[in-house]
């Protein structure tokens, strides 16, 4: 990390002397790293090379001393200290490193050096023990010192940089800088440190041997209860393998990025969340040791793929204090290995997808995850509520929607996508598996033609077949010898397949590689051909979710400029009449037609505002999203899908889209304003943070009806939670936020119950059942942490059954005040979702029917989950919903609550800014 400083005192004199000795005027190291921060106390923290050597111990053998120095350095890299006999110089074993993390050598016998070492801030023994649990790459620095010296460095930091503990502790992290380090990023770091704020960025650093590497640096401040700055934690992740590097600024002729996926923003999102695990240890070292899971070691993962994201909450209410029982924060750059080793051995393949890019691959639900529970799960448990934490960031992180990977990124196969519309048909996407196979970094291959895999023994006739297929826009499957970056050759069963757009024109080429050690014979080749062709088809379907990279930037948002036409049930409302009046005047609805009233919430891509249509008295909610952020966060296709979905909706429990338009910088959606706010806030306002069963039944029933309608339209919602359930003035619900939803086609079915024929069934009240569900499964890693279904985490592909899982979580939260699987960290939450049995606390009385419903909805196998066979009909028929008049549910009066939705004053005030909703249903 870096800091501001002024040059003075003996530090400035020493720097001048060093400049004279090195023969140049500006302070640079061997790599050309500038001392841009001008520390005032640099002399206090000399490197190992500059430190004076003390006399050798009596009778010490010189050669043995050299060996001991090497051993000391290796021990320091593991956080240990080599103990030697001061008379013989013989190693006597190792011991734990002092709390500062600094290994002592015989040179510390020098009194002057002892005094200097004593001035170095050191972490406490308790904190050192807590931090030693983590094997990630990070440092802790002293924020009370102007130079921010390092107090502690993890073993991962030594392994990544090549430096030893003696060379690191007490120094500022600027020694990692070099000639290629971007000074603008350094300025950002300095500003963050000066302000005591967070920083996350990718910078080019240098190892001790001069090797450059891309370092994803995340800095977070540690403050005491009074807000005083104490420490900084700096977490490093080497992302050289996966980042675009300097290619992130390369654009096509149309101005869009050359790469199909923007990795930089995604990596930063992951890292911001990951550092929260270390923050928890620094703020409360005992929290880890006191945890029942304190024996679980965090494993280091030096790739982008294992980190997690932090994005501000979508709605303003999320910044509030919500339930005291909410858990704290820890998210690490690691695979989900936060379960006992015994479980890990049996679950390894099932978690492989999550280990790749937080689930970026195809995994399966393991048998032991689906096995029946030994004890009766419906018996009330005496388990305590999850631990409460005061971490504001963690509270927000748990409740916000996350978008960790597209379906394309989760395909764990060796493949690339090229664009023939660009010169030389360059690579615009490469899978992580392809990078591992070929040993190249992503930065090295983006924008290049695939010919770099060829070598001396590559058959030229086979290469011509591939070129002819490209020229003819046809498929081809061949075997040829290719070479990795290190020169290792391998037989490649290569399949080339064109990907066409809706007009039939070739959009991309998909190249799938099936590697082998030798030439594959005919029978085996046929099996391989089937496999690579199937993979190519999956890639084709997944890539179609993303916008065409050859579109002009303005064309990406063209759908948002289309005029919105009223759907049948809402066209005669006062709101629609006001909108239509503007359109009839010949004007297009735009930002100029609305007056901002107040902000309603904000998120990582934009904000929501209450606005008034000028001179009408009609109020709406306007969602404004920043175009540049949408591009950088790979959310263009999400915004496009949300606009398409809103255009389809015509239901009382779902929002109405009145208009959409774009400005130079934003896209805007105009929908209903719900003065009742979020169900989340309503829950929070209740004395015990829970609702009684009648209220839960009412809200859950309306959610079921809304989800049933969405599924009939081919929409998988994927983000059900109290924050996304808004309340109208009449107390009825409206689901909102469809930016994580999936739109596909629908397959309607009508069938009779199996236990009766048509006549007998009608006499018994068993009428034909209408059932419709989205046809195409998805594999995106999206949702909200506590509500995500197991199949999303494992990467096994998911259907509309994920919405029924989320309904089970919603029921639990409304009844008990918290979600059943939440953990201190995101990884712990995900591990709980995959492994932990659901418990029903005895402290709150909940009916057997309610517990049965939650138990059946929270079945880890989606095929056996309630709602997977007959959809919403199965859920509607559950005993918990007995007494609900489904056809007339809109006429049902909302239940009375301990704290009502509106007070009398609220009714008077909010009634002035409420749409007049005519009941057309």
Curated annotation (Swiss-Prot):
Required cofactor(s): FMN
The record, for PROSITE patterns, names: PAC, PAS, PROTEIN_KINASE_ATP, PROTEIN_KINASE_DOM, PROTEIN_KINASE_ST
List compositional bias (Polar residues) regions by residue number: 97-117, 286-295
- Binding of ATP occurs at 600-608, 623
Listed binding positions for FMN are: 172-177, 190, 205, 215, 236, 449-454, 467, 482, 492, 513
- Highest rank taxon of the organism: Eukaryota
Q: Which UniProt keywords apply?
A: ATP-binding, Chromophore, Flavoprotein, FMN, Kinase, Nucleotide-binding, Photoreceptor protein, Receptor, Repeat, Sensory transduction, Serine/threonine-protein kinase, Transferase
Biased composition regions of type Low complexity, renumbered to the chain: 40-51
This entry's Enzyme Commission designation comes to 2.7.11.1
Q: Which residues carry this modification: S-4a-FMN cysteine?
A: 173, 450
Q: Where is the composition biased (Basic and acidic residues)?
A: 312-321, 366-376
Domain PAC, first and last residues per copy: 197-251, 474-528
Q: Which Pfam families match?
A: PAS_9 (PF13426), Pkinase (PF00069)
List the active site. 719 (proton acceptor)
Entry function: Protein kinase that acts as a blue light photoreceptor in a signal-transduction pathway for phototropic responses. Regulates a wide range of physiological activities in plants that maximize the efficiency of photosynthesis, such as chloroplast relocations, stomata opening, and leaf expansion.
The entry assigns this protein to a family as follows:
Belongs to the protein kinase superfamily. Ser/Thr protein kinase family.
Subunit info here reads: Homodimer.
Know the name of this protein? Phototropin-1B
């Amino acid at each position: 990390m870096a800091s501001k400083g002024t040059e003075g005192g003996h530090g400035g004199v020493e720097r001048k002397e060093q400049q004279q000795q090195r023969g140049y005027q500006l302070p640079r190291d061997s790599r050309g790293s500038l001392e841009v921060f001008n520390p005032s106390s640099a002399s206090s923290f000399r490197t190992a090379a500059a430190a004076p050597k003390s006399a050798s111990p009596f009778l010490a053998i010189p050669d043995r001393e050299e060996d001991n120095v090497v051993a000391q350095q290796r021990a320091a890299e593991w956080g240990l200290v080599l103990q030697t006999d001061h008379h013989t110089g013989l190693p006597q074993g190792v011991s734990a490193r002092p709390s500062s993390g600094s290994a002592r050598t015989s040179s510390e016998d020098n009194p002057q050096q002892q005094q200097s070492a004593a001035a170095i801030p050191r972490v406490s023994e308790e904190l050192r023990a807590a931090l030693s649990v983590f094997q990630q790459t990070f440092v802790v620095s002293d924020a009370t010192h102007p130079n921010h010296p390092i107090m502690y460095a993890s073993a991962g930091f030594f392994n990544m940089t090549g430096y030893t503990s003696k060379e690191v502790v007490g120094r500022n992290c600027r020694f990692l800088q070099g000639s290629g380090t971007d000074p603008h990023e350094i300025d950002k770091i300095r500003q963050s440190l000066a302000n005591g704020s967070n920083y996350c960025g990718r910078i080019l650093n240098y190892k001790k041997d001069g090797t450059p590497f891309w370092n994803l640096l995340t800095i977070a401040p540690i403050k005491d209860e009074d807000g005083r700055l104490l420490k900084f934690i700096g977490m490093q992740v080497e992302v050289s393998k996966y980042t675009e590097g300097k290619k992130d600024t390369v654009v096509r002729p149309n101005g869009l990025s050359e790469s199909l996926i923007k990795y930089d923003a995604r990596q930063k999102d992951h890292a911001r969340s990951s550092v929260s695990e270390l923050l928890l240890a620094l703020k409360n070292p005992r929290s880890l040791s006191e945890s029942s899971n304190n024996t679980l070691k965090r494993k280091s993962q030096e790739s982008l793929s294992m980190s997690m994201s932090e994005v501000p909450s979508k709605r303003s209410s999320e910044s509030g204090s919500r339930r005291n029982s909410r858990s704290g924060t820890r998210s690490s750059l690691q695979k989900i290995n936060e379960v006992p080793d015994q479980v890990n051995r049996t679950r390894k393949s099932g978690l492989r997808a999550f280990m790749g890019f937080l689930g970026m691959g195809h995994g399966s639900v393991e048998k032991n995850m689906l096995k029946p529970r030994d004890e009766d799960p419906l018996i009330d448990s005496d388990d305590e509520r999850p631990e409460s934490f005061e971490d504001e960031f963690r509270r927000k992180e748990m409740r916000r929607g996350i978008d960790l990977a597209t379906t394309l990124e989760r395909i764990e196969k060796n493949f690339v996508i090229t664009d023939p519309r660009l010169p030389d048909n360059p690579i615009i996407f490469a899978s992580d598996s392809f990078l591992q196979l070929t040993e190249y970094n992503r930065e090295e291959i983006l924008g290049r033609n695939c010919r770099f895999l060829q070598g001396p023994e590559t058959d030229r006739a086979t290469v011509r077949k591939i070129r002819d297929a490209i020229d003819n826009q046809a498929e081809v499957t061949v075997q040829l010898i290719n070479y990795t970056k290190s020169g290792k050759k391998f037989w490649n069963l290569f399949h080339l397949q064109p990907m066409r757009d809706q007009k039939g024109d070739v959009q991309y080429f998909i190249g799938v590689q099936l590697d082998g050690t030798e030439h594959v014979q005919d029978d085996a080749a046929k099996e391989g051909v089937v496999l690579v062709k199937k993979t190519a088809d999956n890639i084709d379907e997944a890539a179609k979710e993303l916008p065409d990279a050859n579109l002009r930037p303005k064309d990406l948002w063209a759908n948002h400029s289309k005029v919105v036409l009223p759907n049948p049930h809402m066209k005669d409302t006062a709101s629609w009449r006001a909108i239509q009046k503007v359109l009839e005047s010949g004007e297009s609805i735009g930002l100029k037609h609305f007056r901002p009233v107040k902000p309603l919430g904000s998120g990582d891509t934009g904000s929501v505002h209450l606005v008034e249509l000028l001179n009408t008295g009609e109020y709406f909610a306007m969602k404004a999203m920043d175009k540049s952020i949408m591009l950088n966060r790979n959310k263009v296709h999400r915004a496009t899908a949300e606009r398409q979905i809103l255009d389809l909706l015509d239901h009382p429990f779902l929002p109405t889209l009145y208009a959409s338009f774009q400005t130079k910088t934003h896209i805007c959606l105009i929908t209903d304003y719900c003065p009742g706010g979020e169900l989340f806030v309503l829950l929070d306002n209740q004395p015990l943070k829970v609702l009684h069963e009648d209220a839960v039944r009412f809200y859950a029933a309306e959610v079921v009806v809304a989800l049933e309608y969405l599924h009939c339209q081919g929409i998988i919602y994927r983000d059900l939670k109290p924050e996304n359930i808004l309340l109208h003035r009449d107390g009825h619900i409206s689901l909102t936020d469809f930016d994580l939803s999936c739109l596909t086609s629908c397959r309607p079915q009508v069938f009779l119950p199996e236990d009766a024929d048509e006549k007998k069934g009608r006499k018994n009240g068993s009428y034909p059942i209408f059932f419709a569900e989205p046809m195409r499964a998805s594999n995106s890693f999206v949702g909200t942490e506590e509500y995500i279904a197991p199949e999303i985490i494992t990467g096994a592909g998911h259907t509309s059954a994920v919405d029924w899982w989320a309904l089970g979580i919603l029921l639990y939260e409304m009844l008990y005040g918290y979600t059943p699987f939440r953990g201190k960290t995101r990884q712990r939450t995900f591990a709980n979702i995959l492994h932990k049995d659901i418990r029903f606390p005895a402290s709150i009385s909940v009916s057997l029917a309610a517990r049965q419903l939650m138990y059946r909805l929270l079945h880890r196998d989606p095929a056996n989950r309630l709602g997977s066979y007959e959809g919403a009909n199965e859920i509607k028929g559950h005993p918990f919903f007995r007494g609900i008049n489904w056809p007339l549910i809109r006429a049902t009066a909302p239940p009375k609550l301990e704290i009502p939705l509106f007070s009398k004053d609220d009714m008077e005030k909010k009634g002035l800014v409420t749409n007049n909703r005519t009941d057309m249903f």
